[in-house]
């Protein structure tokens, strides 16, 4: 009878070890859940950035103001008979 109880305890310990430390065990599950949460957070940031870029693309395709703004500030372009003043702040 003692041998039987000893074998049952040994099997129970073996299963517990496999549950906690084995492949797809509890620790592996927690690590994977943490990685999933991190990836979801990264995906949310990327989704927000994509929405901003999509809105900018839509504005460039449909509106003249965005194209005009880019031409003025990125390429220093002006309309005919227009004077553009660029004020630079002093650096201390």
UniProtKB/Swiss-Prot annotation:
InterPro entries for this protein: Cell_div_FtsB, FtsL/DivIC
Primary localisation category: membrane
A biological process from GO: FtsZ-dependent cytokinesis
Transmembrane regions listed in the UniProt entry: 4-21
Pfam families with a match to the protein in the record: DivIC
Periplasmic side: 22-92
Keywords: Cell cycle, Cell division, Cell inner membrane, Cell membrane, Coiled coil, Membrane, Transmembrane, Transmembrane helix
NCBIfam families: PRK00888.1
Family the entry assigns: Belongs to the FtsB family.
Protein's name according to its UniProt entry: Cell division protein FtsB
């Amino acid at each position: 009878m003692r041998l039987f109880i000893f074998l049952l305890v040994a099997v129970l310990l073996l299963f517990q070890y496999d549950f906690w430390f084995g492949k797809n065990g509890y620790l592996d599950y927690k690590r994977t859940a943490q990685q999933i949460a991190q990836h979801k957070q990264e995906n949310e940031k990327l989704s927000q950035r994509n929405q901003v870029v999509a809105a900018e693309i839509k504005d460039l395709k449909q509106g003249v103001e965005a194209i005009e703004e880019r031409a003025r500030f990125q390429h220093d372009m002006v309309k005919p008979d227009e004077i553009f003043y660029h004020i630079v702040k002093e650096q201390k």
